C-alpha cells in the first residue's frame, strides 16, 4: 500500500480537522 505525499498530506489534514471538531 503506497500513498503519494500529496495524498498523505490531504489525509493528515482531514484527520486533524476532524480531531479538532
Curated annotation (Swiss-Prot):
One Gene Ontology term of the molecular function aspect: rRNA binding
GO cellular component: ribonucleoprotein complex; ribosome
Record carries keyword rRNA-binding: yes
Keywords: Ribonucleoprotein, Ribosomal protein, RNA-binding, rRNA-binding
Record family assignment: Belongs to the universal ribosomal protein uL10 family.
Function text: Forms part of the ribosomal stalk, playing a central role in the interaction of the ribosome with GTP-bound translation factors.
Subunit record text: Part of the ribosomal stalk of the 50S ribosomal subunit. The N-terminus interacts with L11 and the large rRNA to form the base of the stalk. The C-terminus forms an elongated spine to which L12 dimers bind in a sequential fashion forming a multimeric L10(L12)X complex.
Protein name (Swiss-Prot/TrEMBL): Large ribosomal subunit protein uL10
